[in-house]
């Protein structure tokens, strides 16, 4: 997840020292059982950090998605313990259209307290939003926004994109197109004899396992993509193979 592996230590910095505990699950998803096992490990009282929230990414870094039932199960576990549920929705539109449910069903109705609503990965420029379903969680957020340097002069010209992004369902149309292209690419790779799919294709990302010589030829021809590995794939990849991430838009 970005909050663990791609943001330097910014989350710890802006929370004045919060500790982030990364959890692993199949396909980049965590389950209620995985969260419960982690919470049971906090047994040393004041010597342990105090759990305050669980953050999930939908769609995940591997292109898999959390269903409404997946989210409800995590919420049902943590809410009695006083924890908040945050959703990293940088690819929320892709998850939503892939599942075919409503935004409400996948967020506040499933127990999400707040979410990062992504737009930059779905056609916008320098535009994301934070949505609070639990208004108590928004306390002091305006101050935190300014302290983080996010109150930039003339931001209204960037923020105006949100109106066009949401109007007429453009954000969903963009995501449907990207998801459809990902499915098409994945099907082509499945039919080939030189590559295979590493994770279920449920959004707009395809993780392909291919021979290194093929990877080198594609890069030489100008194709842009990134190598990406996951602990769960260790042992499944041969020495002459590589895992690459292909993102469609």
Q: Predicted segments — roles?
A:
Residues 1-5:
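Conserved PLP-anchoring active-site segment centered on the Schiff-base-forming lysine
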Residues 7-16:
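Active-site-proximal loop->helix
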Residues 16-61, 66-73:
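PLP-dependent aminotransferase-class I/II
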Residues 50-60, 65, 98, 102-203:
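Active-site C-terminal subdomain of aminotransferase-like
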Residues 53, 84-86, 114, 243-245:
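Structural preference for beta-strand elements that scaffold enzyme active sites
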Residues 66-97:
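Catalytic PLP-binding core of fold-type I/II PLP enzymes
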Residues 183, 188-249:
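Conserved C-terminal alpha-helix-loop-beta "cap" of PLP-dependent enzymes
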């Amino acid at each position: 997840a970005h909050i663990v592996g791609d943001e330097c230590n910014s989350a710890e910095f802006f929370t004045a020292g919060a500790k982030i505990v990364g959890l692993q699950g199949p396909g980049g998803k965590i389950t209620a059982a995985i969260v419960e096992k982690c919470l049971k490990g906090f047994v040393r009282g004041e010597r342990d950090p105090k759990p305050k929230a669980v953050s999930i990414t939908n769609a995940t870094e591997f292109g898999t998605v959390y269903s409404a039932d997946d989210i409800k199960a995590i919420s049902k576990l943590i809410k009695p313990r006083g924890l908040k549920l945050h959703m990293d929705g940088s690819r929320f539109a892709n998850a939503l259209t892939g599942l075919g449910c409503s935004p409400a069903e996948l967020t506040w109705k499933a127990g999400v307290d707040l979410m990062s609503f992504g737009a930059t990965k779905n056609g916008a420029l320098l535009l994301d939003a934070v949505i609070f379903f639990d208004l108590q969680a928004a306390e002091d957020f305006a101050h935190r926004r300014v302290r983080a340097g996010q109150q930039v002069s003339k931001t209204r010209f960037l923020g105006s994109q949100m109106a066009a992004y949401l109007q007429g369902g453009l954000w969903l149309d963009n995501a449907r197109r990207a998801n459809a292209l990902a499915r098409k690419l994945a099907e082509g790779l499945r039919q080939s004899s030189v590559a295979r799919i590493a994770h279920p294709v449920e959004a707009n990302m395809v993780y392909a396992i291919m021979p290194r010589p093929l990877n080198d030829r594609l890069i030489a021809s100008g194709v842009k993509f990134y190598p990406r590995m996951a602990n769960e794939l260790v042992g499944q990849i041969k020495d002459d193979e590589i895992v690459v991430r292909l993102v469609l838009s």
